[in-house]
């Protein structure tokens, strides 16, 4: 950020500035001496006016390339160079891999692979008379430019091969390998290892480890062990270059929360060819840098996979058919030759040899013989997409897109909720056993019959959700902890109910609506109002009956019914759950089964003419037993009089003048006349009839 301009230095005019390496943005890895305090000293033979980048050896380019997942072979300098070589039709210069073996042997040493399904190939080579020191400036500079710090010459060589060849490598200090052997096996249950970053991990049989004769010394494909790391005193090393099963490395890295450069390479795929090439390159560098001497003791355990090219025959006409253009045979041969596929054309048949490093092109099974789309992709990306001409369909039937009834109903439901000021939330489709315990569900509850995920993101997300209530309660708790003490949320998502475990068929996947409200102004009747609004928006009617649920208040919970079918529930969260989640306000939960509710999606609305006569309203307060529900009272009122249009509960009261064990509930009852206006006497008779029915049915009295 310093601007260099004309100034005076000790009384003399100066048009430049003497800089340190730090001021130029250089580090010790990029240029020797740049990391020290003081001015950066350049070579004595440097010419005035020369470009500093050239003098410091930094006249280089760094490419930031976004790779697609199907091209793991391009995760290296060599892989990109192959592509550039094919595009520019320039010869590929392979890294030097020659070295000289001495007659020295590591007597009695052996290598075993006990889990060949997880380790198709394992190579090891013994190097002695090792001298640990700094890497040369050119190597440190190149490593720094690709984001890696120099450590020591031996370790730097393994990192250099990783970036250059794309082959993860590791070096063991032989003085710490006990039992004179290396064994590749599955870890034992609860076996432990301390990795190079001094973190201890507990493993299981799903993890692959590299062991000596006594203990694990590396977590295969992820990181080496601290007990065999390269030290300043190291005198002999055993180099490892292997191919590990990508799925196993991915699962191990995620389960242990251990992502490394090596695991990233293995997860995308490393081929057998790179295993051999990487080892040869590392040994060449050891010899070139004078770091050690290469012995004749080496091992290459191969389970039968070959690094020879795999033949493949496809139809030229099918390749052109996929592309929609005619690519000349000469062009196809040229392109495939440049890509190192050794092509031959005989009539309509194109035969190619797929190199081992192009695993994305290899047949995946005996029936995987029609790979012409892959060949077409290789041809067109080199031939040029600009050769593909615009074409129009000769005839096509245009259909209008749109939502089906279920999608329309779900969208309308969401809009209804949003108009009520309820915010939509989204959660993971997973939860944990702790969430089921939070809901205090009994052991035989269907919600506890949850599908376990084989490879969970973490243990808190190890089960497929069987209810949305736990996620909503946790969301309310998180909001309150962040200082939001009131709010309304909803989520529409799927739950998964298996018929039995372990799974023998697809689970019952159901869309569910979950609404959560919290705050000092929220109540049971708020949630009931939300439910009624949903029903009104669909031109249906909900009825409510008391229900007992382990996570809801025993007297403030109801099940929701529509035409006699149970479609959900709502109620106040139980006090012990609110306390467990440290909630500071009351919270309410509702779940509606949208699979059941979808029966009424798209229902045709029926309209009635507006009455010519004025509606009559009466406020009625009743005294009743505490165990009588609001729904029972409302249903009884409707049965007593056919002119009842609407019933609204506006007050519930206990104590004072109300006898013990009783409560008062006050309703606004609206009567809608149809044929004639109602006078006072007629409405009074309606009220008397309602009171009589309530008295007979529930021993309910009109409050004076």
Features from the language model and the residues they span:
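RNA/tRNA-interacting regions in translation and RNA-turnover enzymes
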Residues: 1-406
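Flexible, glycine/charged-enriched surface loops at secondary-structure junctions
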Residues: 91-101, 150-155, 286-299, 344-347, ...
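Beta-rich nucleic-acid/ligand-interaction surfaces
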Residues: 99-103, 353, 397-398, 402, ...
């Amino acid at each position: 950020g310093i601007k260099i301009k004309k100034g005076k230095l000790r009384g003399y005019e100066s048009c430049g500035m003497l800089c340190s390496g730090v001021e130029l943005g250089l580090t010790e890895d990029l240029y020797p001496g740049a990391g020290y305090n003081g001015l950066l000293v350049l070579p004595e033979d440097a010419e005035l006016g020369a470009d500093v980048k050239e003098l410091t050896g930094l006249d280089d380019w760094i490419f930031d390339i976004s790779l697609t997942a199907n091209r793991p072979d391009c995760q290296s300098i060599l892989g990109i160079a192959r592509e550039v070589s094919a595009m520019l039709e320039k010869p590929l210069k392979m890294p030097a891999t020659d070295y000289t073996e001495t007659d020295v042997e590591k007597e009695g040493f052996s290598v075993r692979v006990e889990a060949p399904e997880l380790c198709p190939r394992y190579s090891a080579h013994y190097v002695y008379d090792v001298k640990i020191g700094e890497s040369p400036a050119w190597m440190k500079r190149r490593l720094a430019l690709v984001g890696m710090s120099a450590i020591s010459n031996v370790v730097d060589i393994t990192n250099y091969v990783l970036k250059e060849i794309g082959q993860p490598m590791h070096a063991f200090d032989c003085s710490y390998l006990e039992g004179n052997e290396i064994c590749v096996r599955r870890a034992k249950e609860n076996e432990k290892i301390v990795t190079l970053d001094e973190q201890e991990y507990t493993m299981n049989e799903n993890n692959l480890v590299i062991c000596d004769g006594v203990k694990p010394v590396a977590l295969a494909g992820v990181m080496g062990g601290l007990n065999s790391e390269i030290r300043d005193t190291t005198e002999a090393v055993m180099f490892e270059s292997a191919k590990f099963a990508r799925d196993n490395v991915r699962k191990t890295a995620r389960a242990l929360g251990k992502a490394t450069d090596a695991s990233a390479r293995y997860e995308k795929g490393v081929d057998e060819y790179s295993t051999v090439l990487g080892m040869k390159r590392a040994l060449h560098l050891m010899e070139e840098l004078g770091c050690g001497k290469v012995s004749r003791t080496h091992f290459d355990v191969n389970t039968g996979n070959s690094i020879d090219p795999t033949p493949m025959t496809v139809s030229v006409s099918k390749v052109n058919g996929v592309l929609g253009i005619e690519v000349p045979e000469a062009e196809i041969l040229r392109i495939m030759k440049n890509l190192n596929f050794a092509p031959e054309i005989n009539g309509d048949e194109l035969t190619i040899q797929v190199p081992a490093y192009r695993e994305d092109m290899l047949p995946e099974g005996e029936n995987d013989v029609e790979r012409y789309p892959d060949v077409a992709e290789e041809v067109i990306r080199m031939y040029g997409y600009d050769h593909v001409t615009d074409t129009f369909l000769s005839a096509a039937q245009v259909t209008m897109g749109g939502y089906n009834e279920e999608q329309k109903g779900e969208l309308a439901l969401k809009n209804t909720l949003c108009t009520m000021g309820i915010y939509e939330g989204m959660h993971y489709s997973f939860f944990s056993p702790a969430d089921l315990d939070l809901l205090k569900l009994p052991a035989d509850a269907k919600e506890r019959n949850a599908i376990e995920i084989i490879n969970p993101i973490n243990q808190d997300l190890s089960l497929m959700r069987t209810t949305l209530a736990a996620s909503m309660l946790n969301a309310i708790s998180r909001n309150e902890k962040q200082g939001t003490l009131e709010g309304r949320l909803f989520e529409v998502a799927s739950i998964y109910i298996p018929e039995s475990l372990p799974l023998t068929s697809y689970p019952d996947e159901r869309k569910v609506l979950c609404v959560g409200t919290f705050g000092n102004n929220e109540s049971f009747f708020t949630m009931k109002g939300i439910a009624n609004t949903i029903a009104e928006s669909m031109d249906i009617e909900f009825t409510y009956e008391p229900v007992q649920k382990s996570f809801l208040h025993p007297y403030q919970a109801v099940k929701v019914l529509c035409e006699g079918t149970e479609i959900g529930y709502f109620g106040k969260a139980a006090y012990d759950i609110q306390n467990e989640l440290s909630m500071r306000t009351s919270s309410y939960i509702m779940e509606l089964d949208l699979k059941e509710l979808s029966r009424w999606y798209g229902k045709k609305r029926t309209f009635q003419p507006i009455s010519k006569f004025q509606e009559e309203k009466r406020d009625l307060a009743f005294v009743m037993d505490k165990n009588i529900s609001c729904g029972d009272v409302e249903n009884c009122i409707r049965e007593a009089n056919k002119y009842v249009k609407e019933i609204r509960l506006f007050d519930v009261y206990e104590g004072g003048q109300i006898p013990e064990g009783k409560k008062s509930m006050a309703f606004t009852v609206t009567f809608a006349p149809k044929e004639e206006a109602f006078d006072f006497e007629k409405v009074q008779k309606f009220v008397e009839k309602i009171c009589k029915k309530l008295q007979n049915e529930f021993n309910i009295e009109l409050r004076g």
